[in-house]
Regions:
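Short glycine-/aliphatic-rich beta-strand segments at the starts of folded cytosolic domains
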Residues: 2-14
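One-carbon transfer enzymes
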Residues: 40-280
């Protein structure tokens, strides 16, 4: 006797009347129970997005073939198991984002399997190994950016992760590296993009006398800090904050934004279309 499975069906297609009925009727035909369903129409682009969480006994090939015959030309659909995903985390020396992810993964705040943490410095090895997670060093010294990214990419690929998380990984990635993991690399940026791109963002913010500081979690593409935005948040500051005060406050925002973004990504709620995301 087959046990029930739970899977997530994600659909992107040109908008037409009756799409929800077509998709749900096919699920009914396959005797699948719809646990949750969310949809959105982007009227500007004429695109329909739908996330459907299903439970039942699946014949993936037949289900997808039936969907293909019912959906308009140019449709994208994917069916993946619901639940726990695998990630590899990349780090340099800063511990706040990594530590938050390790704690949440260990105590149930994130339903994730951290396959490994890989760094270009040894600084965070002790922290990682306290959680019985492998730490791997891929030293960048003496290597070109391309050579180092090749070694780093090979180390990541050995773990076959669903996503790669940059937890304050302070290296600019080559286009070749990004191309190996399309729409799978998630970065936390230390400002409310597009403001204060580059180094020393909190010092830039202090010099400008800003009244809010924030953080942005986004997918990585070939343009530095310009990939599709997943999550953002800000906190209010005032003239009494030094650059160091802003940095401390900013670290709290960074770790919260990264974990919230990762929560949505792991649940397969984030759709990438162009340089935007839709979260269902």
């Amino acid at each position: 006797m087959h046990s029930l499975q739970r899977k997530v069906l994600r659909t992107i297609c040109p908008d037409q009347k009756g799409l929800i009925a077509r998709i749900t009727n096919i699920c009914y035909k396959h005797e699948l129970n719809i646990v949750q369903n969310n949809e959105f129409v982007d009227h500007r682009t004429g695109r329909f997005f739908m996330r459907t969480e299903l439970e039942g006994i699946f014949n993936d090939a037949t289900l997808l073939a039936d969907l293909d015959s019912a959906l308009p030309e140019g449709s994208i659909r994917e069916l993946n198991p619901a639940g726990r995903r695998r990630v590899v985390i990349l780090v340099t020396k800063e511990a706040h984002c990594l530590g938050d992810l390790l704690m949440k993964a260990n105590y149930g705040g994130l339903d994730v399997d951290i396959a490994a943490v890989i760094g270009n410095h040894e600084t965070l090895r002790t922290l990682v190994e306290r959680f019985d997670i492998p730490f791997e060093l891929v030293n960048h010294e003496g290597l070109s950016r391309e050579e180092h990214d090749q070694r780093m990419g090979d180390a990541i690929a050995a773990h076959d992760p669903d996503y790669v998380v940059l937890a304050k990984y302070m290296r600019v990635l080559t286009p070749e590296f990004v191309a190996r993991f399309p729409n799978k690399i998630i970065n936390i940026h230390h400002s409310f993009l597009p403001a204060f791109i580059g180094a020393r963002p909190y010092h830039q913010a202090y010099e400008r006398g800003v009244k809010i500081i924030g953080a942005t979690a986004h997918y990585v593409n070939d343009n530095l800090d310009e990939g599709p935005i997943i999550m953002q948040d800000v906190i209010h500051v005032d003239h009494t904050y030094t650059a160091e005060d802003m940095m401390r406050a900013g670290r709290d925002v960074e770790k919260n934004v990264l974990s919230r973004a990762l929560y949505q990504v792991l649940a397969q709620r984030v759709f990438v279309y162009g340089n935007r995301t839709i979260i269902l």
